Each structure stands twice: as structure tokens, then as C-alpha cells.
Amino acid sequence: MYFSILQLPFLIYPVFGNFDFTGYTMVSKIAGAALLLAIMSNFALADCFDRAGSYYSIDPDYLRAISWQESRFNNAAINGKSAGGTTDYCMMQINSRTLADLRREYPSLNKDKLYSSPCLCIHVGAMLLRRNFNKYGLSWLAVGMYNAGMSNKQTSIQNRYNYAMLINDHYKKIKAGIIQRPHIE
């Protein structure tokens, strides 16, 4: 069965709602539901950086910038050459000493879980950055402490500053599209 273009508005009315011939716009419950679904799916489509950023009130591109600096978004990354003989795990390079401290609060948290769940790794990194912000304020000092720790030695102070400036540079490149945002579930 074929329909002319003039018959189309009458055919879609029962399904989609009212059709306004003057503005050629359609008002319907289905269109509203589709809009709501599209808005809701943005959160469902959000990757782990977006969800962790939202949960910890941190711009997710800062989390991406840290992950880029620490591992180039590689969740299998490991660094066994950290200061004090510690090891850093997963894409957010969670330090083994920090992980041991976190196990007091989260006994089941371990390096295997960080490696098997990139999203968990991102959330742990976001939590650590949020704790730095809560303790030291929303500052580059807090960002620098993510990597260089809290020591007040001159080299640590310089390392914190250098790290923070690297993160800021990566952040700008992510915003500009020079560093591509990965979609990590």
C-alpha cells in the first residue's frame, strides 16, 4: 500500500501524537520519551573516566590527563622503579604503598583487581586525587602530589610542580582533541 506525502501526517497521528501543519512540528509522548532516553543514555554511554569524574566531582579530562601521563591509557602498565622500592599498577599507576594503605579501608582491593578492571583503577585514582583536593585544596599542589607525594624536600617540590604542569599540558591537548579520549568501560 502506498501513501502520498499529504496522507503521512494523518497516518502518524495515532502513533506519534499531534502534527502541526503550520510549523511542520510534531508534539508527541514518543518524541518526549525519545528525548529523555537520549539524555539518559548519555550517562549510560559515559565511560569510566566520565563516571568517576562525576562521582568525585573532578573534570574527567583531568583524570584522562593523569592516565595519559602515567601509562598512555594502558591498564597493563607496571612501574617497578618507583622511589622507595615500591611498584605502581594499572593505567592510573596506583602505588603499592598507597594500595596497602587503601586495603585497611577496602580489604578486598588488590593489584589483580586493578588490572582486571580498568574502571576500578580509574575510580581508585579519582578517589586519591579527590582526597588530595580535600586535604590541600583545588590546586596544582594537590595534582602534583598524586605523583610526587608529600615530602617537602626541594626535589619533591620541584617534581610536584613539573608533574602538575605536564598534567595541565595533557589536559589542554585532550580538550583540543590532540590526545584522543579513550572510551573505557
Question: What are the residue ranges of the model-derived segments?
Answer:
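Sec-dependent signal peptide recognition
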Residues: 4, 27-36
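Catalytic glycan-binding domains that act on GlcNAc-containing polysaccharides
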Residues: 45-185
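Cationic, low-complexity basic patches in intrinsically disordered or flexible, solvent-exposed regions
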Residues: 8
